[in-house]
Amino acid sequence: MTILTKYNRPVFFYFWSMLIPAVLWFGMAYLSHLPEQTSATQIGQTVLGIAGLVSPMLVALHLFRQDADLWNDLKHRLSLRQHFSPFAIGLILLLTYGSIMAAQVISTFFGYSWVQFHISGQPSFQSAFVSAWFVLTFAPLVEELAWHSYGTDALLNKFSLFSTSMIFGVYWVIWHLPLAFVKGYYHSHVVAEGALASINYAASIFLFVLIMNWLYCKFGRNIWISVLFHLAANTGNEIFNTHPDTKIIQTLIFLLFVIAMIAKDHKLFFAKYSA
């Protein structure tokens, strides 16, 4: 018996991790569309937004506190000494910052501007009352302390790594949907850019999850690997003045990497995973 068999409450985890944020974020969306944006309204949006982000982590924490073996496994996987190497950091930066910069270079051959390499210092979206940079850096931390503390392992207990990634990809697309209704938020901008941008966003999530889960498993289920990858992807896609079409090129780069990754590590993706 492996430790993964202890991660045996996926329905509980995923149900509450979907329902609570959805309720909070639809409330946030309602406040964002009020004609008068007072300080109280903006604070309300911030509180609801952060509470929605944090809630899956709290659901996971509730499950960890009920089982000593799970709690010990969590502490082990949060150790920076476990598989968190300079090689891992370099690979993550190459996959995130490297891919977006490569996409920007390729885009110039199709007439897009080198201005994309300008570090704007201003994200493409806004957030009520707190800096958008706070959202970009805080979200990867609290999300991965949910998804890669309990969520991924709960799926790996039943499914292969590939199936786990596909299931979670669908879940994560739906999980983000309420944010598309929040005025001025990143996801509402993606929808406003049109169907192609929305499809690319959804497709990129599946590739992102496949790569992140591969890194997670290759580096000993270290949660900080997932946090860093998510953080680097968020900041890398917002720090430059990247054209939305260039992100489609980045998705294609991810696709090529994923094809090579699965071909090389076929057994890891399709055999029963053992922690």
Feature names for model-found ranges:
Residues I100-F109, E143, S163-G184:
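Transmembrane alpha-helix/helix-exit interface in multi-pass inner-membrane proteins
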Residues T2-P140, F168, F240-A275:
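Specific transmembrane helices
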Residues A102, F138, G151, F208-M212:
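Hydrophobic/aromatic residues in alpha-helical transmembrane segments
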Residues L136-L141, V173, Y201-F206:
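Residue-level hotspots within the lipid-embedded alpha helices of multi-pass solute transporters
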Residues V23-F26, S165, V190-F254:
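Functionally important transmembrane alpha-helices
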Residues V142-I174, C217-N222:
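Membrane-interface helix/loop boundary segments of multi-pass membrane proteins
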Residues A146, Y150-G151, V182-E193:
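Membrane-interface interhelical connector segments
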Residues I3-T5, H83-S85, G121-Q122, P178-A180, ...:
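Hydrophobic, membrane-facing alpha-helical anchors
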